[in-house]
Amino acid sequence: MGLMHSTMVPLGTPAVSFELSGSDSKVYSLESFADKTLLVIIFMCNHCPYVKAVLQRLIDLQKETEYRGVQLVGINSNDAQRYPDDSLENMQIITREKGINFPYLFDYSQQTARAYNAVCTPDIYVYGLERKLIYRGRIDDDWEHQEQVTQRDLKEALDYIIAGKEIPFEQIPSMGCSIKWKEN
């Protein structure tokens, strides 16, 4: 499984443009979300136990925050040839079965993950209206047991940002499986 921690890209780093196909058969770009106040990009996949454990939390977070102008976007950058569970076809199945309520995009070339310096699943990046990085870190303090969560880092960060306040707590790296890079 190979546990990895996110690289903690510097705050203020601009979002990188992309154009990726979604599990809903639409093509999305960074500009597709221009009307959203906050953009939460989550590098994720279908097979990683860390992602499986938090997926419902992400679905719930989208429901909780969409009326406030928050848009979650999942991006799967794994090599689907070596990891067929992470194919676009299986993304479509997972989207239907789990009721994923945010765009789930396939980064076939892996260029988007490399441009964002993403290394693990899940790897979370929050961008403000000007699309500068304002939060990167974990979703909460217990990836494995939702009922034992005592700090919802991502949700709390979104609340502070929406209120126009600085995030007062340390941003702790996300952790999960490594992105499954293509062999050159």
Spell out what each predicted region is.
Residues 1-171, 178-184:
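Chalcogenol-based redox active-site neighborhoods
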